[in-house]
Amino acid sequence: ILDNRIEKISNCFKQASEEYGYKAENFIIYPIKVNQMRPVVEEMINHGKKFNLGLEAGSKPELHAVIGVNTDPGSLVVCNGYKDESFIELALLAQKMGKRIFLVVEKLNELNLIAKMAKQLKVKPNIGIRIKLASSGSGKWEESGGDASKFGLTSSELLEALDFLEKKDMKDCLK
């Protein structure tokens, strides 16, 4: 079932990419909070290799679990959720060990922590930014988007983040 679903998601995205001329590389990311059982995660990883499957960790315990799983060196690990110094340190140490870690900034203060820890550990972090769109979608999750969303940076915070990265000579870390 898992193999079939990974393949179906990949094929649907490939078809949509061709239809709309989307050329960028894409990845399927499995949030391990869905099911943290090692056999399930390993099955996702093993079958997902040919589909650029990566893992998402939304907490420090999840990040420990992700680091402990044998993934491909090119496989993405996306770090979302609340990030304190110890979470960021663990993520950056995993990056130094060869994991392909991306820290997704959801609050402006996280950038300071990432910059501080990266400097201490002498590592160039991979940074993503979650933005809070002014408009919201429709359907079940309509109220969790737009200005009412509790996650992501506003457009003015995004500009502050870009200024911060430029001043810290870290603009190239934004992926």
Feature locations, PLM:
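Surface-exposed helix-capping loop/turn segments at secondary-structure junctions
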Residues: 13-22
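Active-site-proximal beta-alpha core segment in soluble small-molecule metabolic enzymes
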Residues: 21, 26-175
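N-terminal hydrophobic targeting/anchoring segments and the immediately downstream early-domain regions
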Residues: 1-13
